[in-house]
Curated annotation (Swiss-Prot):
Residues bearing attached sugar chains per UniProt: N61
GO molecular function, one term: prolactin receptor binding
Domain of life: Eukaryota
Protein name: Prolactin
Role according to the record: Prolactin acts primarily on the mammary gland by promoting lactation.
Sequence positions bearing Phosphoserine: S56, S64, S120
Pfam family, one: Hormone_1
Cell compartment(s), UniProt: Secreted
Similarity field: Belongs to the somatotropin/prolactin family.
Gene this chain is encoded by: PRL
Quaternary organization: Interacts with PRLR.
Length: 229
């Protein structure tokens, strides 16, 4: 890895350390969130958004690095990219494709859409980690990122639930998500089929993490700064 890549990764890790346990109701010496003995811990909406944006950006960077590593090691010359277009399990969720489309959507709808996308990745991320562990000579650069993304996706989902609870208190959101049925493909005996299944899943993860990152930045600007940013 070149110096620029090492520096970027170091910066991202530092940001993550700064917001470790960022959505947990704990009192931290440098950032006292809850008074001693508090029962219902509340983090400010601005802090929640700040931390969610940092975390979503971290997840997107990890997913991009993991996809690029897999592409370099396993996908060269196989023509996978032409088959991967519009074949994500989350395609059933109607998500805006760019910032202009997202700006036309009410923030309540966009918040719930983020929740649905994050929930749609719980199952595939769990199985991704399991199946990568089972790969012969699985590269640590891929496995370590898969493990980290699975953990941070759960943390981001928890944070988003807190954000929705503050923006729309009292509203119970149905746990709607897009079901993933790609496990058999990750376990196929045919190498080309199996590698494409991994490639496609990582391609979709990179795509969706980028969307969530953009949606959160837009929502933070709209809700926290009244679109004045």
């Amino acid at each position: 890895m070149d110096n620029r890549g090492s520096s970027q990764k170091g910066s991202l890790l530092l940001l993550l350390l700064l917001v470790s346990n960022l959505f947990l109701c704990k009192s931290v010496a440098s950032l006292p969130i809850c008074p001693s003995g508090a029962v219902n811990c509340q983090v400010s909406l601005r802090d929640l958004f700040d931390r969610a944006v940092i975390l979503s950006h971290y997840i997107h960077n990890l997913s991009s690095e993991m996809f690029n590593e897999f592409d370099k090691r396993y996908a060269q010359g196989r023509g996978f990219i032409t088959k991967a277009i519009n074949s994500c399990h989350t395609s059933s969720l109607s998500t805006p494709e760019d910032k202009e489309q997202a700006q036309q959507i009410h923030h309540e709808v966009l918040l719930n859409l983020i929740l649905r996308v994050l929930r749609s990745w719980n199952d595939p991320l769990y199985h991704l980690v399991t199946e990568v562990r089972g790969m012969q000579e699985a590269p640590d650069a891929i496995l370590s990122r898969a493990i980290e993304i699975e953990e941070q996706n759960k943390r981001l989902l928890e944070g988003m639930e807190k954000i929705v609870g503050q923006v729309h208190p009292g509203i119970k959101e149905n746990e709607v998500y897009s079901v993933w049925s790609g496990l058999p493909s990750l376990q196929m005996a045919d190498e080309d089929t199996r590698l494409f299944a991994f490639y496609n899943l990582l391609h979709c993860l990179r795509r969706d993490s980028h969307k969530i990152d953009n949606y959160l930045k837009l929502l933070k600007c709209r809700i926290i700064y009244d679109s004045n940013c």
